[in-house]
């Protein structure tokens, strides 16, 4: 794949280029230090991915991303910045990933792998594949693989695979993950729109679970189920969601 690094700091560009050169999926790397140079390169070249800083000297990387998205063959955008406060806006622009400085090899490789997987899915979209795969690849929310949440004026980037469940009680949404739990004032509906339906199942009007974290399913009162998830989190499937739950897990 061909990558473009956009950053007005030479040291940051050099560091990122070094790490990308260690990745076998990257065949060619070019650099740009400002908006004008970036747009010129995008006009005459085709890139698979662009690593984009947010604080550029002549313009915001967010504004540049908006311009890139309007291009006919726009590359996958990966924001590479020292500022986490723009994460929500970045994902609203359908960014593939959001990486914080200082860069780490593993994190860079993860971002490159996301682009590689997205390209493979795009190539296979016209092939005959299973309904489960179609559901996941057609769901644009699954392309980023992360959920940005804001807690106490700080934005946390959660990988979908780390999220165990989301539940609401008294207007507070609790997000349980494999590492810790978070509480936010955003509605469950707000997060439901950002989560891929291929991975997350709504089992109650106030609860969404990650089906990959379901450990056991027990018969419960009134012909319902009780679920035990990772870290022994327990949730009940309400009767009104039983049919959908069984269908999504292939229990019928």
Curated annotation (Swiss-Prot):
- Origin: domain of life: Bacteria
| Compartment list | Cytoplasm
Record-annotated membrane-spanning stretches: none
Q: Which UniProt keywords apply?
A: Cytoplasm, DNA-binding, Phosphoprotein, Transcription, Transcription regulation, Two-component regulatory system
Which SUPFAM superfamilies does this UniProt record tie to the protein?
Answer: CheY-like
Post-translational modifications? Phosphorylated by LytS.
InterPro entries reported for this sequence: CheY-like_superfamily, LytR-like, LytTR_DNA-bd_dom, Sig_transdc_resp-reg_receiver
Gene3D superfamilies, from UniProt?
2.20.25.10, 2.40.50.40, 3.40.50.2300
Main localization category: cytoplasm
4-aspartylphosphate is found on 53
Write down the Pfam families for this protein, in alphabetical order.
LytTR, Response_reg
Q: Pinpoint the Response regulatory domain residues.
A: 2-116
What's in the GO CC field? cytoplasm
| GO-annotated molecular function | DNA binding; phosphorelay response regulator activity
Q: What does this protein do?
A: Member of the two-component regulatory system LytR/LytS that probably regulates genes involved in cell wall metabolism.
Query: What name does this protein carry?
Result: Sensory transduction protein LytR
């Amino acid at each position: 794949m061909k990558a473009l690094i956009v950053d007005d700091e030479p040291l940051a560009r050099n560091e990122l280029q070094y790490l990308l050169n260690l990745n076998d999926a990257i065949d060619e790397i070019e650099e740009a230090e400002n908006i004008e140079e970036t747009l010129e390169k995008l006009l005459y070249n085709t890139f698979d991915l662009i690593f984009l800083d947010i604080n550029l000297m002549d313009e915001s990387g967010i504004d540049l991303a908006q311009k890139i998205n309007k291009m006919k063959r726009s590359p996958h955008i990966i924001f590479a910045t020292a500022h986490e406060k723009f994460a929500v806006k970045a994902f609203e622009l359908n960014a593939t990933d959001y990486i914080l400085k200082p860069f780490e090899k593993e994190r860079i490789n993860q971002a490159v792998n996301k682009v590689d997987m997205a390209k493979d899915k795009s190539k296979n979209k016209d092939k005959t594949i299973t309904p489960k795969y179609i559901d996941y690849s057609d769901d644009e929310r699954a392309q980023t693989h992360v959920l940005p949440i804001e807690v106490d004026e700080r934005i946390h980037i959660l990988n979908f695979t780390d999220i165990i469940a989301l539940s609401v009680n008294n207007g507070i949404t609790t997000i349980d993950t494999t590492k810790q739990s978070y509480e936010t004032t955003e509605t469950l509906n707000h997060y439901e729109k950002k989560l891929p339906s291929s991975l997350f199942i709504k089992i109650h009007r106030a609860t969404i679970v990650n089906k990959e974290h379901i450990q056991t399913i027990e018969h419960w009162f009134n012909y319902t189920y009780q679920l035990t998830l990772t870290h022994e989190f327990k949730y009940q499937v309400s009767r009104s969601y039983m049919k959908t739950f069984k269908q999504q897990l292939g229990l019928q």
